[in-house]
């Protein structure tokens, strides 16, 4: 990996990226309300489960395949699979989350003129667009390798989940850093599993997440949008 590719992925995984990731907890806040999370250990276990049981089987392999489709500029497959991913979201708020963040990242890519004109036109025509599809576009525009792209995406997800736990549980900063360190190995394993997953084996089935997310939509008191 070149320094340019590394810096590009650090940029994409940064919490400073203006796509609104900080405003979502992806069910963590609802899990807290259901008393599934109540301290640092249960927060770590929840985030680890989301990484290994949900992302590694669904979002990460989907991202890898969308990355390959952007490289090939396979527009029909990009559009079809993007629509499939959006339809697979288990609740209205999870669908709005991926659409809002995907749109924001796509707008950023267009404004910064990442990628060639033909691919930018394809990106602009994809509405709504899921976050992994937009992330794959940005990564492809910087010629980043698939394993590094997935690692950056997974780390950004873990970091955002940890940040949500710090605010909602609440936890201290050191507890948050311990969670991130503890999940480094799980990120590597999730990436390896995702890269070995063929397109027809991508699986976003996550009933507990779906139920908690649906409950969160009417939760009395909330900090986050999901």
Curated annotation (Swiss-Prot):
GO terms for cellular component: cytoplasm. One of its GO terms (molecular function) is nickel cation binding. The keyword Iron does not apply. InterPro entries: UreF, UreF_sf. The keyword Cytoplasm applies. Disulfide bonds: none annotated. Its main location: cytoplasm. It is found in: Cytoplasm. Keywords: Chaperone, Cytoplasm, Nickel insertion. Belongs to the UreF family. Required for maturation of urease via the functional incorporation of the urease nickel metallocenter. HAMAP family: UreF. UreD, UreF and UreG form a complex that acts as a GTP-hydrolysis-dependent molecular chaperone, activating the urease apoprotein by helping to assemble the nickel containing metallocenter of UreC. The UreE protein probably delivers the nickel. This is Urease accessory protein UreF. It comes from Burkholderia lata (strain ATCC 17760 / DSM 23089 / LMG 22485 / NCIMB 9086 / R18194 / 383).
């Amino acid at each position: 990996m070149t320094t340019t590719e590394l810096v590009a992925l650090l940029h994409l995984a940064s919490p400073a990226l203006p796509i609104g990731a900080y405003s979502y907890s992806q069910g963590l806040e609802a899990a807290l309300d259901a008393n599934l999370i109540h301290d640092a250990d249960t927060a770590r276990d929840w985030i680890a489960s989301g990484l290994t049981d949900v992302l590694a089987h669904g979002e990460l392999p989907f991202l890898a395949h969308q990355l390959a489709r952007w490289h090939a500029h396979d527009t029909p497959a990009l559009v079809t699979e993007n629509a499939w991913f959006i339809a697979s979201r288990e609740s209205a708020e999870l669908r709005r989350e991926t659409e809002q963040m995907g749109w924001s990242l796509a707008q950023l890519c267009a404004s910064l003129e990442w990628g060639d004109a033909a691919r930018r036109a394809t990106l602009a025509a994809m509405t709504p667009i899921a976050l992994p599809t937009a992330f794959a576009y940005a990564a492809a525009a910087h010629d980043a390798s698939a394993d590094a792209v997935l690692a950056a995406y997974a780390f950004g997800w873990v970091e955002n989940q940890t940040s949500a736990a710090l605010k909602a549980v609440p936890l201290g900063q050191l507890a948050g850093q311990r969670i991130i360190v503890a999940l480094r190995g799980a990120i590597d394993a999730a990436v390896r599993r995702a890269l070995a997953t063929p397109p027809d084996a991508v699986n976003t089935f996550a009933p507990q997440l779906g139920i908690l997310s649906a409950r969160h939509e009417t939760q009395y008191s909330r900090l986050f949008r999901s």
